[in-house]
């Protein structure tokens, strides 16, 4: 995430160059607190008839992962890429961050119990093309601590069958 994102006008000034590549284009991210920024960006791209093929979300949510259809429809039926995913937000003290934030077995189990449902929702959503777990938060949320210590959620994630990501019919 970028704490000082460019304004929408600056991004749009560069967008035509990106469209010329012919590659699929992903929106700017929905960094924390940026719904209005993302709304303005998508509205302006659509108003101009420009391409934006994919919606990029950062999901530091305590709930709502089962409602990806809302974001898909709100932002013009674009496939969703979640580039940062964690159960909760450290700055809101919710989700796994409502704990003491240690790598304890109890916290690992709590995170695993929640993340199993979240992964299941995302893996079964026709609107989510891909997602990436954000591992750079407190120890209580880690998939991998250090270079080799998998958490319970990390072990689950390592063996999880997520299915096909890209679906041409949604393009």
Language model feature labels by segment:
Residues 1-8, 26-33, 49-61, 80-88, ...:
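Active-site groove signature of glycoside hydrolases
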Residues 3-10, 102-114, 148-152:
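Alpha-helix N-cap and loop-to-helix initiation/capping positions
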Residues 8-27, 74-77, 118, 125:
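Active-site neighborhood of glycoside hydrolase catalytic domains
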Residues 11, 33-49, 64-75:
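Distinct, well-ordered alpha-helical segments
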Residues 13-14, 40, 70, 113-118, ...:
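Alpha-helical elements of Rossmann-like donor-binding domains used by nucleotide-donor carbohydrate transfer enzymes
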Residues 14-15, 19, 26-44, 54:
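Active-site cradle of extracellular carbohydrate-active enzymes
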Residues 57-98, 120-129:
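Glycoside hydrolase catalytic-domain groove-lining segments
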